[in-house]
């Protein structure tokens, strides 16, 4: 089976170019919903930042962003994007969520866009996110819920994940994902489906 890092390194080569008008709109909606929960003094952890599409939108609205991705090539593209746009308050690092350099209670906001459906140990990931947030910190996520209804995208990802050509994929239903976030110690503040097929659930939550 292909590793997560190798898979996302490969996807990085034309990731931005493959986002069609529909997905581009979903990213725009994600950014719009996110900005409503950001404050000028916030320190943000952008978990699985990818090529930095949403990171770039967040940057002018907060004090500092630590953007991380398991893929060194995704991280490199995000870093270059920040340089190209003159962004100086974003630090991009190739690492994972469990890097001990990320200290508990050190972030006002953690964002996780289009990544929760690709993590196999979701309980551990959500617990780690909670630990990294300051008391009352906000967790903002957008996740494909491939189990909500049958779609071509879902079938394709199921086949690829079961034949080893892409890593693990979770098939959440929207209510199931919302419940998992709540059970991890968060109060759900807002939920909205941003995309028809597959459903892409935006959840704004606060650490209890």
Language model: regions and residue ranges:
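A conserved beta-strand element that flanks and buttresses the S-adenosyl-L-methionine
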Residues: 111
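A short glycine-rich, Lys/Arg-flanked "PGG" loop and its adjoining helix->strand segment in the class I
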Residues: 123-135
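Core SAM-dependent methyltransferase catalytic element
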Residues: 184-186, 190-208
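Short catalytic micro-motifs in class I SAM-dependent methyltransferases
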Residues: 114-115
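Class I SAM-dependent methyltransferase SAM/SAH-binding core
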Residues: 45, 51-99
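Conserved class I S-adenosyl-L-methionine
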Residues: 1-39, 140-162, 195
């Amino acid at each position: 089976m292909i590793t997560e890092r190798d898979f996302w390194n490969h996807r990085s080569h034309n990731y931005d170019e493959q986002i069609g008008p529909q997905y581009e709109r979903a990213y725009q909606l994600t950014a719009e919903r996110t900005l409503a929960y950001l404050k000028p003094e916030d320190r943000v952890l952008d978990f699985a930042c990818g090529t930095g599409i949403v990171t770039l939108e967040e940057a002018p609205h907060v004090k500092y962003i630590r953007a991380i991705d398991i893929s060194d090539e995704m991280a490199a593209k995000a870093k270059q994007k920040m340089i190209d746009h003159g962004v100086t308050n974003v630090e991009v690092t190739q690492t994972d969520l469990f890097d001990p350099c990320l200290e508990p209670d050190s972030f006002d906001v953690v964002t996780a866009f289009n990544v929760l459906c690709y993590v196999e140990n979701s309980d551990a990931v959500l617990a780690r996110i909670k630990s990294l947030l300051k008391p009352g910190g906000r967790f903002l996520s957008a996740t494909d819920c491939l189990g909500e209804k049958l779609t071509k995208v879902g079938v394709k990802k199921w086949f690829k994940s079961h034949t080893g050509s892409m890593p693990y994929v979770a098939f959440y239903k929207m209510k199931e994902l919302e419940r998992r976030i709540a059970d991890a110690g968060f109060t759900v503040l807002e939920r909205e489906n941003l995309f028809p097929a597959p459903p892409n659930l935006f959840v704004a939550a606060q650490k209890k």
